[in-house]
Each structure stands twice: as structure tokens, then as C-alpha cells.
């Protein structure tokens, strides 16, 4: 599926200042459209993870507004906030799986926002949602691991289970916060290929934080450079020249992400 001009993520003069006075984000204006594959790059502590976590409000911002599909997640509360977050799948560097549970049970937790707590505890998922989980595992080519315990999988397989979990959520957006940081090159390619296929074939908007500029240039349609909490570059991959990349990574930022 191709990109559209429909904005799914909007930052309107967004700033984040931590209680200790450290500036996480400074006056960020940003629009990401449906179907884009955006990679955010910058030094550790530049604010990449802060930006990512502002999208689904894992971090509250200090100023400005963040909108998802035109609706303010900054101002949302209760059920309205839950409904917005249902649209946003999240993949973490640390996988965040329940090691002693099966792959299937882990993937089904992607439906947590659709069930009352007691049904989740008892594992009372509908046949339709179980099919969603199987389909998601098929997408990442792990359908043969349905009943395998998560802690019996390799790191790359665990990250692909995390991708399947995000897919089971039926999101319009997937956020990937350093998804390949602990993976070897071969496994990195597998995970990034999965994300690109999901983006291209399903039309799901992908926003990823990556340390590797080479991987970013290989997979992104657009690169955003963050330095000291500020957006210093935003454009197509072809415009991210060596000089621009060097400027994004210049300086010595304090850890804030």
C-alpha cells in the first residue's frame, strides 16, 4: 500500500521538560502521514525515545499537543485514551514477553485493550482473536512456534513475537523503540524486513528509533534527526546526506531518553 496525505500523528509545538530540568523535547512540530515508514535517528540521549513515548503518551509532555488521527491524545482521559492507544502498537528493545507463557498467549496480550481484566486473567479470548494471533504469527513466519514457551526462543524470534503481538492489536501505527539494538546483523535484517512488509502490504504506519544510520537508510521512506531534543532534520532518505547525518550526530547530549 502507498503512503497517503492523511495525517495519523501530529506534534504541535511539543516540549518535554523532566523534573530535574533536563529538556527532552523542544518545540517539536511534526506530521506523519498514513503509510509512511519513518526512522528517527540521533545520539543516545538526544530525545528519540522521549519523542516515541510522547506519541502514545507513555510520557506526558510539558507543552503543546500530540494528535492521533486528528484526536488529541494529550488531553484524552479514560476510555477515550484507551481507544486511541488501541490504534498504536509498541515494540520495545527488551521484547517485554512473559517468558513462562506460550508464544500464543504472549501474542494474545495484544488484545488486552479489548477485554475486561477478569477475562484476560482467565484467558477467555474469542475464536476471532485467536485467529488474529495465528495470522499475525504467520505474518512473521512463526506459526510453528505457537505453543513454544517464549523463553525457549532466540532473541530474534522473541522480537518477531513482539511484532506479532503488536499486529494482533490491529493497529494503524506501530512504534518500534530500538527494536534491533540487541540483535545480530542477520536477525536485524529479518526483523526489519518484517516491519517493512507490514508497512508496505498492510499500510500500517511505522515509526522506529534506530542507532544504525545504515539500517535507517535501507528501510525508511523518511528520516527525522533529533539533536538535544530538537528536530534538526526531516526529509526523504535521499536527502539525508553524509554531511547532514554528521551534523545530527554532532555534540554531546545528556541522556534523556
From Swiss-Prot:
Signal keyword on record: no
SMART domains: AAA (SM00382)
Enzyme Commission number, as recorded: 7.3.2.2
Annotated ranges, domain ABC transporter: 9-253
GO cellular component: plasma membrane
Subcellular location: Cell membrane
One term of GO molecular function: ABC-type phosphonate transporter activity
Chemical reaction(s) catalysed: phosphonate(out) + ATP + H2O = phosphonate(in) + ADP + phosphate + H(+)
Keywords: ATP-binding, Cell membrane, Membrane, Nucleotide-binding, Phosphonate transport, Translocase, Transport
Pfam family, one: ABC_tran
Family: Belongs to the ABC transporter superfamily. Phosphonates importer (TC 3.A.1.9.1) family.
Chain's role: Part of the ABC transporter complex PhnCDE involved in phosphonates import. Responsible for energy coupling to the transport system.
Name of the protein in its database record: Phosphonates import ATP-binding protein PhnC
Protein source organism: Lacticaseibacillus paracasei (strain ATCC 334 / BCRC 17002 / CCUG 31169 / CIP 107868 / KCTC 3260 / NRRL B-441) (Lactobacillus paracasei)
Organism phylogeny: Bacteria, Bacillati, Bacillota, Bacilli, Lactobacillales
Amino acid at each position: 500500500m502507498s503512503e497517503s496525505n492523511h495525517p495519523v500523528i501530529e506534534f504541535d509545538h511539543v516540549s518535554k521538560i523532566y523534573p530535574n530540568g533536563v529538556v527532552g523535547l523542544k518545540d517539536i512540530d511534526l506530521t506523519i502521514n498514513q503509510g509512511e515508514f519513518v526512522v528517527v535517528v540521533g545520539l543516545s540521549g538526544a530525545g528519540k525515545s522521549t519523542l516515541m513515548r510522547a506519541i502514545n503518551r507513555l510520557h506526558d509532555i510539558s507543552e503543546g499537543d500530540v494528535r492521533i488521527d486528528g484526536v488529541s491524545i494529550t488531553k484524552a482521559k479514560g476510555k477515550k485514551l484507551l481507544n486511541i492507544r488501541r490504534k498504536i502498537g509498541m515494540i520495545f528493545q527488551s521484547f517485554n514477553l512473559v517468558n513462562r507463557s506460550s508464544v500464543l498467549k504472549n501474542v494474545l496480550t495484544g488484545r488486552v485493550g479489548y477485554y475486561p481484566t477478569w477475562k484476560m486473567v482467565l484467558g477467555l479470548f474469542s475464536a476471532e482473536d485467536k485467529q488474529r494471533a495465528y495470522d499475525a504469527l504467520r505474518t512473521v513466519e512463526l506459526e510453528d512456534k505457537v505453543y513454544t514457551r517464549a523463553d525457549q526462543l532466540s532473541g530474534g524470534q522473541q522480537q518477531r513475537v513482539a511484532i506479532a503481538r503488536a499486529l494482533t492489536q490491529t493497529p494503524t501505527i506501530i512504534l518500534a523503540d530500538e527494536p534491533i539494538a540487541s540483535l545480530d546483523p542477520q536477525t536485524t535484517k529479518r526483523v526489519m524486513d518484517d516491519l517493512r512488509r507490514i508497512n508496505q502490504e498492510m499500510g500500517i504506519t511505522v515509526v522506529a528509533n534506530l542507532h544504525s544510520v545504515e539500517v535507517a537508510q535501507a528501510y525508511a521512506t523518511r528520516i527525522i534527526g533529533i539533536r538535544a531534543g530538537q528536530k534538526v532534520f526531516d526529509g526523504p532518505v535521499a536527502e539525508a546526506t553524509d554531511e547532514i547525518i554528521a551534523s545530527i550526530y554532532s555534540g554531546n547530549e545528556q541522556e534523556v531518553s
